[in-house]
């Protein structure tokens, strides 16, 4: 059974309260939600909520996601934020400041084996 998207599973108030608590407890980390693109044939993540260091490059976070998905070396993994591919050298804190959800405070990332949406 496919899990419901995080935004559908929890109310805006619940999500905002949770992200605020995470940031208060860990000010050097950002709250990130990682979900599979609906039409991707990649496996579902066991865990979709992450507390990521602000100074971690996007490429390092993608490496962590690859290992959690147990992907073979030849399997492509693309991570999108607002339907765009962030640069792998960009720091997660910078991506968060540019793309965080203003309503609930989480950064939403989507992963796929395809490089484009549509």
Swiss-Prot record:
PTM remark: The C-terminal Gly is amidated with phosphatidylethanolamine by an activating system similar to that for ubiquitin.
Gene Ontology CC terms: autophagosome membrane; cytoplasmic vesicle; microtubule
One BP annotation, GO: protein transport
Disulfide bridges in this chain: none
One Gene Ontology term of the molecular function aspect: phosphatidylethanolamine binding
Keywords: Autophagy, Cytoplasm, Cytoplasmic vesicle, Cytoskeleton, Lipoprotein, Membrane, Microtubule, Protein transport, Transport, Ubl conjugation pathway, Vacuole
Lipidation (Phosphatidylethanolamine amidated glycine): 118
Pfam family of the protein (one): ATG8
Subcellular location: Cytoplasmic vesicle, Autophagosome membrane; Vacuole membrane; Cytoplasm, Cytoskeleton
InterPro entries listed in its UniProt record: Atg8-like, Ubiquitin-like_domsf
Gene3D superfamilies to which the protein is assigned, alphabetical: Phosphatidylinositol 3-kinase Catalytic Subunit, Chain A, domain 1
Protein family according to the UniProt entry: Belongs to the ATG8 family.
PANTHER family given in the database record: MICROTUBULE-ASSOCIATED PROTEINS 1A/1B LIGHT CHAIN 3-RELATED (PTHR10969)
Name used for this protein in its record: Autophagy-related protein 8D
Organism annotation: Oryza sativa subsp. japonica
Designated gene of the protein: ATG8D
């Amino acid at each position: 059974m496919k899990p419901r998207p995080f935004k559908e599973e929890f109310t805006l108030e619940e999500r905002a309260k949770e992200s605020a608590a995470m940031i208060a407890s860990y000010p050097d980390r950002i709250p990130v939600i990682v979900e599979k693109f609906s039409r991707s044939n990649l496996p579902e993540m066991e865990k979709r909520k992450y507390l990521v260091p602000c100074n971690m490059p996007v490429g390092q976070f993608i490496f962590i996601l690859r290992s959690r998905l147990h992907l073979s070396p030849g399997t492509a993994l693309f991570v999108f934020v607002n339907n765009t591919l962030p640069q792998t050298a960009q720091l997660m804190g910078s991506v968060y400041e540019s793309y965080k959800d203003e309503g609930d405070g989480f950064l939403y990332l989507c992963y796929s084996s395809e490089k484009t949406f549509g």
